[in-house]
Amino acid sequence: MIHIRIGLDPCNAAVQRDLADVYALHRRVMSLFPPQLPPDERILFRLERSAGWASLVIQSLITRPGWAGPLHPLVIEVEPDYHPGQSLAFRLVANPTRRDGDRGPRVAVEGQGAWREWLARKGDAAGFRVRDATVADLGTAVGYRPEPVAARPIRLRLVRFDGALEVADPARLAAAVRHGIGSAKGFGCGLLSLGQTNSNEF
């Protein structure tokens, strides 16, 4: 897998437009890759923001991105290698949803308790147990597809989870890292980043 971290200038007008529209940000990320990707490729990304700065964390399985201009990304290659009982720090920005009935639309899950339950269920399916987690409400992200594709904007409820997990099933965890967790993976959700428990680096 290939991990890329790109620092963004939040004072740049183009960056401001992308940060205000999840669909525009999706298009910006995908513009770094060839139009035709291998069928088994999966591009995941996460926007990280704080006062006065922003960065994009991007993950691809096999395709290296390209770019022009004054970008100085950090690029590393990693391969998931976990073992049962291993403790790892994690970060995940997700769009917690549930199905409204057997065939109904997906609706946002709301509230700290429901978000934690959602994470626990996803962890069980993805081969890990949550040992500790902080939950941050990131609000609702909005995106606008060009007409006439969609008349209504994209609205995504975003929640960030940071904490520690224990590996239960290394193969399932590796699959979750490669392919993401939850919905809205094309719009900055689902990238599960893992690191050592004594490090803030993901």
Name each model-derived stretch.
Residues 1-202:
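RNA-interacting cores
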